[in-house]
Amino acid sequence: MTAMLDSFATDLTAATSLHQPGNLPHPPHAIDAENVPLSGGTDPTYGEVRWRTLINGTEAAPRDMVLGIAEFGPGHQLRPHRHTPPEFYLGLEGSGIVTIDGVPHEIRAGVALYIPGDAEHGTVAGPEGLRFAYGFASASFEAIEYRFTASA
C-alpha cells in the first residue's frame, strides 16, 4: 500500500508559479493535467482506476488541499473504501454509480457529490467510462490513509 501511495506524489516542477502577494501562506500555481502522468491501473486492492493528482502538497511546496482527476474505462471500478477527510467528486465525462454508505448515486458531467469523512464509498463506471475531479482539504494526498473494505 505504501508503494501505491508513493505513486500519488506529483512533481510540481511543471507547475507555473503565479504572482504571490506577501500575505499568502502558499504560492499559487497553475498546472495542465496533460503534463501530469497517470498513476494507478489495475490492482486487486483498489480496482481499475487511473488518476492524476494535480494539486498536492510536499514539505518543499505545502498546500491546503488536494485536487486530481480520476479516469475509469467502461465498467471499471474503484473498490469500496474509507478515509478520514471528506471528499468531493465533480463529474467531467461519462457516467457511473458512486455508492456512499450503501446508497447509490449517479455521477455524470456536471454532477457534484459530497462524501462525508469515514463514509464507505466505491465507484463503478458506466459503459462509456467515467472521468471526475476529486478533492480533499488535506496538506497532501500521501497524508490520506485509504482503508479498503476488503483489507479492513
From Swiss-Prot:
Species in which this protein is naturally found: Ruegeria pomeroyi (strain ATCC 700808 / DSM 15171 / DSS-3) (Silicibacter pomeroyi)
The protein's name in its UniProt record: Dimethylsulfoniopropionate lyase DddW
Knockout or disruption consequences: Decreased production of dimethyl sulfide (DMS).
Ranges of residues in domain Cupin type-2: 69-124
Catalyses which reaction(s): S,S-dimethyl-beta-propiothetin = acrylate + dimethyl sulfide + H(+)
EC number(s) on file: 4.4.1.3
Pfam families with a match to the protein in the record: Cupin_2
List of residues binding Fe cation: H83, E87, Y89, H121
Job description of the protein: Able to cleave dimethylsulfoniopropionate (DMSP), releasing dimethyl sulfide (DMS) and acrylate. DMS is the principal form by which sulfur is transported from oceans to the atmosphere.
Induction: Up-regulated by pre-growth of cells with dimethylsulfoniopropionate (DMSP).
SUPFAM superfamilies given in the database record: RmlC-like cupins
Similarity comment: family membership: Belongs to the non-heme iron-dependent dioxygenase family.
Consequence the record notes for mutating E87A: Decreased iron binding and enzyme activity toward DMSP
A molecular function GO annotation: metal ion binding
Biophysicochemical property: pH dependence: Optimum pH is 8.0.
Effect of H81A: Decreased iron binding and enzyme activity toward DMSP
Keywords: Iron, Lyase, Metal-binding
Annotated effect of mutating H83A: Decreased iron binding and enzyme activity toward DMSP
